[in-house]
């Protein structure tokens, strides 16, 4: 038997080819579609979604803040009336991947097979992390969409210029997570000065998406900012409470709370949870949101 010096393995790891971003994204999209196919056979919606929920998942829960961890996320889902029967199926229409191939996002359209007919047609946004066992959802949002025809054709992918090897260094990842949170705060701070419309234009990528209204997704800065009035004063602020970021430092997600600038006197205003997917072209470039 041949014996290999430990340095051999270190050199081999260092010289291994970087992952192909397109191949990595194709694997993520395949996983998203496979979870949907599996969900179609489930006894209820929560059971169908459960296999893809990550152990460290953080999911916004309106009126309650956040469900943190897989068990809490599934418990919050079981409280949703429309999730108690039938099943969910979905189709992604866009995906994005980090340069190291360890994190990504998808968004698309979801349909419930039971429950209130007016609430069955939905849309979703998912942020994914790659685990040894496969892709899992770390942040997730779905909402009822407005009536209307939508295209389910795949959009152009969100890809880095090139792939890089993942870095297994907690300090590096922590620094990237902190930078994502800092970008979110700077976004909110800027909105206090120039208003929401201008801040959303300044801090978004040209292909940014907003899912909060309409039958489909608002894609592109003109569509994202269409609902904001020019010069309208900012009445809200927001910040990050949880975040994930790829070791390549080019993709991350911030999860936090939107609060009123004039909170209620009795303290009943708990704010509204949100999450934002951020991308930058390189670790020395500014973060810009790409999906929310």
Regions found by a protein language model. Name each.
Residues 1-9:
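Sec-dependent signal peptide recognition
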Residues 14-51, 138, 144-202:
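Short, low-complexity N-terminal intrinsically disordered segments enriched in polar/charged residues
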Residues 23-26, 45-99, 117-119, 197-244, ...:
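A solvent-exposed, acidic/Ser-Thr-rich amphipathic alpha-helical stretch
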Residues 35-36, 90, 103-107, 125-128, ...:
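Short, structured motif recognition centered on aromatic/hydrophobic residues
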Residues 55-58, 107-113, 209, 255-261:
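Generic short beta-strand segments
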Residues 64-67, 111-113, 143-147, 215-218, ...:
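Solvent-exposed loop/turn segments at secondary-structure junctions
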Residues 115-117, 151, 264-269:
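A short acidic/glycine-rich loop-to-helix N-cap element
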Residues 121-156, 271-292:
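Short beta-strand edge/turn micro-motifs at domain boundaries
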């Amino acid at each position: 038997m041949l014996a290999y010096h430990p340095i051999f393995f270190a050199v081999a790891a260092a010289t291994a080819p970087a992952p192909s971003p397109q191949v990595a994204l194709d694997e993520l999209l395949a996983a998203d579609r496979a979870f949907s196919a599996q969900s179609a056979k489930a006894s209820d919606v929560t059971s169908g979604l459960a296999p893809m929920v990550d152990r460290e998942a953080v999911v916004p829960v309106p009126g309650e803040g956040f469900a943190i961890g897989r068990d809490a996320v599934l418990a919050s889902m079981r409280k949703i009336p429309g999730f108690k029967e039938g099943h969910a199926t979905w189709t992604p229409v866009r995906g994005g991947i980090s340069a190291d191939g360890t994190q990504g996002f998808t968004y698309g359209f979801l349909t419930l097979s039971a429950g209130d007919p007016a609430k069955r047609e939905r849309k979703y946004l998912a942020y994914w992390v790659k685990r040894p066992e496969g892709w899992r959802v770390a942040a997730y949002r779905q909402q009822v969409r407005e009536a209307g025809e939508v295209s389910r054709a795949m959009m152009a992918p969100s890809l880095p210029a090139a792939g890089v090897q993942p870095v297994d260094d907690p300090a590096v990842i922590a620094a990237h997570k902190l930078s994502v949170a800092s970008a979110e705060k700077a976004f909110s701070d800027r909105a206090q000065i120039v208003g929401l419309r201008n801040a959303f234009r300044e801090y978004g990528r040209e292909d940014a998406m907003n899912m909060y209204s309409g039958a489909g997704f608002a894609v592109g800065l003109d569509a994202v900012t269409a609902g904001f009035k020019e010069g309208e004063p900012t009445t809200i602020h927001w910040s990050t409470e949880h975040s994930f970021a790829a070791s390549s430092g080019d993709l991350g997600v911030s999860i936090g709370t939107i609060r009123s600038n004039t909170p209620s006197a009795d303290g009943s205003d708990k704010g509204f949870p949100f999450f934002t997917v951020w991308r930058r072209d390189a670790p020395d470039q500014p973060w810009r949101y790409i999906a929310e």
